[in-house]
A protein has these predicted regions:
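GST-like domain detector, emphasizing the conserved glutathione-binding G-site
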Residues: 1-118
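Alpha-helix C-caps/helix-loop-beta hinges
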Residues: 50, 76, 137-138, 153, ...
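Short, hydrophobic secondary-structure boundary micro-motifs
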Residues: 77-82, 104-105, 140-144, 189-192
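Amphipathic alpha-helical surface "interface" segments used
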Residues: 88, 92, 151, 197-199
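GST-like fold's C-terminal all-alpha helical module
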Residues: 97-179
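Long hydrophobic alpha-helical segments typical of transmembrane helices together
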Residues: 166-199
Length: 199
């Protein structure tokens, strides 16, 4: 059996899953859903959401569920921090990133008037300020790379790869985190999508 990841290269959630696979060095095959207008995805899963995964014959949908399953079956290099309280905080930050930062991304990408752009940038300013405090004096949220950092990076990285927007330099802790992640993931630039199969 094999693992197939149904994905779109520009999706931040698909990037999150790809980073988890690479961190754990789990081999998998990519099925680009854009190549057949999601027909293979719909045929296998009965829905349109990515990432979805054929996990040795088991249909798994959603980046959070995919990450948890891969971590359970490949426990080396855990994507969660040590301790129940830290794991709970990690999951809360992942959820905040997935549910809140995505809306800020979409608002900025879809801003088609100067007013909409200004409002979207003001929303991001609040998030950047929060993240700047979170990463003060830290390379990662916890003592090493975890799913919280991966989820946050994937949302922020989307600004560079899809929105073509750079994080303002006044948020120095955030830009330092992004540079740290760029080096960790071996990206030539933040404008490059993450594609490596292992780290």
């Amino acid at each position: 059996m094999a693992i197939r990841l149904f994905q779109s290269q520009t999706s931040m959630f698909c990037e999150k899953a790809r980073i988890v696979f690479a961190l754990k060095k789990v081999p998998y095959e990519i099925v680009d859903v854009r190549k057949d207008d999601r027909k293979s995805l719909i045929e296998y899963t009965g829905q349109r959401k990515v990432p979805s995964m054929d996990y040795n014959g088991q249909c798994v949908i959603d980046s959070t569920v995919i990450s948890a399953l891969v971590n359970k079956d490949y426990p080396a290099i855990s994507i969660y921090p040590e301790g129940a309280a830290n794991k709970g905080l990690c999951l809360a930050l992942e959820d905040w990133s997935d549910e809140v930062l995505i809306h800020a991304n979409h608002a900025l990408r879809r801003a088609d008037t100067p007013e909409a752009r200004k409002k979207a940038e003001e929303e991001w300013a609040v998030h950047f300020a929060t993240l700047n405090q979170m990463y003060a004096g830290k390379k990662f949220i916890f003592d090493r790379l975890t799913l919280a950092d991966i989820a946050i990076f994937s949302q922020l990285h989307y600004l560079y790869t899809a929105v073509k927007y750079e994080i303002p330099t006044k948020y120095g802790n955030v830009t330092a985190f992004m540079e740290n992640m760029r080096q960790t993931l071996k990206l030539k630039s933040l404008g490059d999508s993450f594609e490596a199969q292992s780290l």
